[in-house]
């Protein structure tokens, strides 16, 4: 089961399913940001984080880097949303999330990449 969030995105004028994510604070380590975002958006902490690598979503016009992590050994805590954040967390079985990707219900690129990579690594026995 993975934690996902439903969030209205004004640019797209629709609510989208996404993995927890956020921007790095100035000088922030990507690993620390991953831990922070999981707690802020899903109200969870984890015993273990495994990097799934990084990717460049918009190489034609931006230097953005997306770092992906999988968190295991989860513990409930409290959400800490930013003042301008309005989202709803939900637990989704990985197989259901995969079906949502394949049916087009999940449209967010980083979420699609993360779910597909996680599913592949699990199938290969690498996680």
Language model regions located:
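Generic C-terminal helix-cap and adjacent flexible tail
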Residues: 120-127
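Unchanged
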Residues: 23-109
């Amino acid at each position: 089961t993975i934690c996902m969030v439903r969030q209205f995105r004004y640019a797209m004028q629709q609510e989208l399913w996404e993995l927890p994510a956020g921007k790095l604070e100035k000088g922030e380590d990507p690993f620390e940001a991953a831990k922070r975002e999981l707690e802020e958006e899903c109200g969870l902490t984890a015993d273990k984080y495994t990097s799934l690598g990084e990717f460049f979503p918009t190489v034609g016009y931006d230097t953005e880097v997306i770092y992906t992590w999988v968190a295991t050994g989860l513990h409930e805590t409290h959400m800490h949303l930013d003042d301008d954040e309005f989202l709803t967390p939900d637990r989704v079985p990985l197989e259901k999330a995969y079906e949502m990707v394949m049916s087009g219900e999940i449209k967010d690129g980083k979420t699609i990449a993360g779910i597909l990579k996680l599913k592949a690594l699990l199938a290969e026995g690498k996680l």
